[in-house]
């Protein structure tokens, strides 16, 4: 919601926080255990506060990001952009203005928040805590701001816009809606193709926005969008009652009466930081983190890993324990990693790596010219309980090798494998050359002979060492080349000045026989957390790796300094804000949760310079590198409390980021003779030995050949097949933009649903699509209501047959329609697996995308039935998860387990309707869940803020029922989390995603699944696990998350030994708390079984 903006002078500004102001943006997850660091702090902090604040930026692998499409980087910015677009799309006023000529922009604007707003339906709707309420000091595009009505978000949910309303949509709104649709897809799916484009849009200026409307309208639309991005907003950590907290005294009185917003100093910091920092992040669609647990001593042998570690590094579970940490590190960085580990051990430091970027080893990582590419990853690692827990995440990184002559240190050659300098040279040539000439204005890499043409500061250091201006002890005993190399390695961080802007880089030097090799690498995107004292602007804590990579400053050089050492203008900007917009003072207690966006600071800077138009072309603020050069950064500020603010500082290059997320194919490992058995073994009557068996290696080789030839039968030949051609073909479709399926997506997409003739069904699908794009609408009361009677009929065994009968009758009714939802599995599943094709279907809705595949809502072109199709990349199917089924053939275990569960179905488990395959994918057909679609439990928790305990009980009871059925069949799910539970509008639950499921007799297991959030302590501790107790632990995490809307544990320390905390303000029953405590016990043998949980008194309904 945006309040009316007045033209009153700043002195007339009044402010009232009379609604719960909740934003949509989410900075990174932060952890709260203390470690030694900075000693200089403001006296406003207690010792406990200080230690916790020091620990936060380095204790968490989410307090930094070098990955522009990770949730804690792209999401931070795109959610702000989405919030702005939603306001514009749903505001007729803004769109009406776009029909007129662009008005002269009133600038600088002023702000007044009225206290006595009329109580209207619009105002009431705006108080929904799901709506991102905005403060609007900088919106300046409307000609009559004082008379502009309050902006409201759309409140119609089940009713779609009628034709008359739809006909009034102007081109500007259509463009905004398309952009909003792309944003939602990127945020929902972490799609590289969309996110890499939107990455730059999220840091956009007016030159980076392209709309199809005429120039005048487009210019106005761009400015409206940029202005909306510059609006501050609130993101509260708790729901406030709907009352006016108009003054500081009123706020203090309220604070005394309500312990849920008490100040940081009044409660235990550990507990408070857990709560305060929770809303800053979302674990959903988190980046593909490879997690390893290894021994703490040399040679650091691996004890356990997650599935994404196997996928990222191209290894199988059978070889994990034969590898060491250094085996995964590229030879160029092994000494660096070794030194860091040894130093941490000598200094008894728990945190070993805080996000250092290093090259890693990955099979088949070659460029188009068959030149080996370096694959880069950030590394976070912590020593705990005799173990070293490591988290890798791939990052984009440009690098060049510069070879210097040993005589005069001139440049002999530059190896630019990633075309780093070439791309920038082309850009500069385009910018500085007229269209009529092709005259080259810059040098290409092979024409550079002076290192000063690449980096002034690097060149200066080399010259200073050569001429004795920089000298260290023992230098006189060393040859000049080694002295130069040592000093460059010691300094390490410089800026590159050969490009359109100064950019930070890191340099590693080695002396070869005839030359010096400089390996220069630069991160296109880097961002990290800096915690600052609100009163003095001194740095309280910061991520050490980001400080070095971005600004070239180490801990001892930055500790206790002012933030102006990094962003010189920030103090003046804060002072200007306090004077001009006093209601935005970051030290006011009522401003806890205030967010000042990147574009807000860009606009403030333009206002301070009295140059209104410079905001629209701004590319950020000036940051200061250690070498004295200025770099461009963006700053987002969040008020933690009256004493501290969080700064999320970003440096991002305006370049097209190459797809760095490619994963090595799993197929080459099929040639490994040491693999005796791959896949699952039957373990119950429901999955008897007749249905599955061991797979010998030669059969797997034949299977790989089959995936290309589409043969009807599996070869029994023992001849070894050449997989090079297979791998090359599959590598083309391995990650990111997949050629074949992208083509299908484009050609087979039916946005108008011309194939759906039935009006009622078409209306339901339209609602499904709408709710997919805006999950908050799905949980509104006129659509979402937990139906207890219906749910009880499902989960009570007595009525199982009755439900099946009702389902069959529904199928019969639907079969009379021209287009229908298919819910009955094929009689012979997989019988047409090489006949049926994906081109037989048309995509109605793109639903999701993950590390292993994609999900689409589709309609069959000929038979007109509607299903959800999950597409699994064959290349990414872990080699350990193939099974040979006598009836179904050689298939992924996910399909085999789903087919097994079909034989003895349970209503809370998603059915397999059919499957088929082609060269690149397996396609799994499943029913559409819910008449108006469904959303996952993560989104229900996120958006359904008013869910009561009884509703949570009904939802959780169904999840327990589904897991009970799995365990009864001798199957463990191994990836229980809120994202793998879908819920329809009646609260009807389905458990999904059996890609990690396995038969219990296949254990014990060494590879765990997913991220740390749901991992049991014994798993993170490196122990092999049986499966059932770990499913139980994940259920406990899930129950806590449903009830308290946050994770029970925030880091490794808490999972391994932290104490459970329960927020008393939530008024949760003792029976529920008791069940959570029973489940989340660290002693494996004392955890309850699924039957005991199912019979628990709290779950008695």
UniProtKB/Swiss-Prot annotation:
Alphabetically ordered keywords of this record: ATP-binding, Cytoplasm, Kinase, Nucleotide-binding, Phosphoprotein, Serine/threonine-protein kinase, Transferase, Translation regulation
Cellular localisation: Cytoplasm
Keyword Phosphoprotein found: yes
EC code(s) of this entry: 2.7.11.1
Catalytic activity as recorded in UniProt: L-seryl-[protein] + ATP = O-phospho-L-seryl-[protein] + ADP + H(+); L-threonyl-[protein] + ATP = O-phospho-L-threonyl-[protein] + ADP + H(+)
Single GO MF annotation: protein serine/threonine kinase activity
One Pfam family per UniProt: Pkinase
Active site: 975 (proton acceptor)
Domain Protein kinase: 841-1099
GO cellular component, one term: cytosol
Class of enzymatic activity (EC top level): transferase
Highest taxon of source: Eukaryota
Predominant place of localization: cytoplasm
Phosphothreonine PTM sites in chain numbering: 118
Cited InterPro entries: Kinase-like_dom_sf, PAS, Prot_kinase_dom, Ser/Thr_kinase_AS
Residues involved in ATP binding: 847-855, 870
Gene Ontology biological-process annotations: intracellular signal transduction; negative regulation of cytoplasmic translation; negative regulation of glycogen biosynthetic process; regulation of (1->6)-beta-D-glucan biosynthetic process
UniProt miscellaneous comment: Present with 2220 molecules/cell in log phase SD medium.
Record's function text: Serine/threonine-protein kinase involved in the control of sugar metabolism and translation. Phosphorylates UGP1, which is required for normal glycogen and beta-(1,6)-glucan synthesis. This phosphorylation shifts glucose partitioning toward cell wall glucan synthesis at the expense of glycogen synthesis. Also phosphorylates the glycogen synthase GSY2 and the translation factors CAF20, TIF11 and SRO9.
Family annotation (PANTHER family): MAP/MICROTUBULE AFFINITY-REGULATING KINASE, PAS DOMAIN-CONTAINING SERINE_THREONINE-PROTEIN KINASE
Family as reported in the entry's similarity comment: Belongs to the protein kinase superfamily. Ser/Thr protein kinase family.
Name this polypeptide is given: Serine/threonine-protein kinase PSK2
Upper taxonomic lineage: Eukaryota, Fungi, Dikarya, Ascomycota, Saccharomycotina
This protein's encoding gene: PSK2
